[in-house]
Amino acid sequence: IIGLVLGYFEGLTDAIGARLLDTLMAFPFIVLVTMTLVAIGPSNLTVILVIGIAYAPLVARTVRAAVREQKQRDYVSAARLGGEGALAIMFLEILPNIRETILIELVTRLGYAFFSIATLSFLGLGIQPPSADWGLAVADGYGFLTGGKWWVVLFNSGAIVSLVMATNLIAQGIGAFENSDA
């Protein structure tokens, strides 16, 4: 919704919102998430919320760009001339036309979120025991590397990589499916 509003309304709203998004995106992701989790304390819900909030500016920026592109189209001008208000144009006209972009962005970020959760769990800041997490499993198996038992880490790491790759392939598939309809 933030990206939708910033993309539709130009001027001061867009300028302030875009600079705020740029500021949030300027912080290194892992540093921002780590500092927040250290300050708040790790729990399953906290980890998910912090990662979701950390990825929100990236999604908002993508949606903003898509809205700005769609806003120049004739169907938006026709809706304005037809007397539709800003909310109706944003939610009934523009939003359905950028659903593919939003869906691809969300699925891609979901894969990155899985990797981020595993990374934080490996560092001891993510999902906490006794909850099951691949990052915790990699951290537990890390000590076995010196004993020559590399497969303990390999299979769990491979599962993480496979999940991230699968979400990226799903996002590409969504894009290919949507583009084949056009």
Residue ranges and their predicted role:
Residues 2, 7-69:
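Generic hydrophobic transmembrane alpha-helix motif, especially the helices
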Residues 4, 33-38, 47, 51, ...:
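Transmembrane alpha-helix boundary and packing residues in multipass membrane permease domains
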Residues 8-9, 78-97, 138:
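Short helix-to-coil transition segments within interhelical loops
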Residues 8-12, 39-41, 83, 107, ...:
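Helix-loop interface residues and adjacent transmembrane-helix termini in multi-pass membrane transporters
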Residues 12-20, 94, 134-137, 141, ...:
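Hydrophobic alpha-helical segments of integral membrane proteins
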Residues 25, 36-39, 66-67, 116-155, ...:
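Glycine-rich helix-loop "coupling/hinge" segments at transmembrane-helix boundaries
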Residues 51-54, 100, 104-108, 149-182:
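C-terminal transmembrane helix and the adjacent membrane-cytosol boundary/short C-terminal tail
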Residues 87-120, 167:
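Transmembrane alpha-helices
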